[in-house]
């Protein structure tokens, strides 16, 4: 069983990465038959869809697959054949990181077929997914913003392509710097952030860990 944990943050040791690590641990703790592959997207040189449309060519050798040659060409094929995928991204302007958006374009666009008759989705398999969204703002800010609607568009298309409603984990009010005194950031209530980091973030990590275990259990139940 192969599960991917894909980090769309440029940092490998802050909130998004920590949550993904907990997801990976939850999955791996289910037994030696579970292989979790952690991918840091910022280690790869790639762009979003280049609109070459090789994935749409009639009788094309790359029909249904991204053919653009760069660092993720093979990775896209490997991820599409995974048993489960967790996508982790910090939130910028209520949306995914640019690297994560580019990766998802390349991963999912080839699997949407522009034809009248079914099937209009040609992904090689259905895959359960998890999204982990780490954001700097307090939860109250998201209640009056389009944040979840914007992120929900990605969840919608992921379900459309991979056939499962994604499980979504939101981590709010995350700790952004190692030393807040070095940065212009007095808009935030630092004591509140410290308290949230000490009391809520461990709960978020546990939720991510549980999501990893639940994904493996779901996959085993399907066999």
Segments (PLM) and residue ranges:
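Beta-strand-loop-alpha "switch" segments that mediate conformational coupling across diverse proteins
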Residues: 167-177
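N-terminal beta1-alpha1-beta2 submodule of the flavodoxin-like/Rossmannoid cofactor-binding fold
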Residues: 1-116, 187-223
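Short, catalytically relevant binding-site loops at active-site mouths
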Residues: 92-94, 136-138, 175
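Short, flexible segments with low predicted structural confidence
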Residues: 75, 130, 179-181
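Cofactor-binding loop segments of dinucleotide-utilizing enzymes, especially the Rossmann-like FAD-
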Residues: 8, 41, 132-134, 171
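Short aromatic-enriched loop/helix-cap "lid" or pocket-rim segments at secondary-structure transitions
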Residues: 48-52, 142-144, 178-183
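Short, glycine-/small-residue-rich phosphate/pyrophosphate-handling segment
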Residues: 99, 111-169
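Residue-level signal for alpha-helical context at structural boundaries
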Residues: 34, 118-122, 147, 176, ...
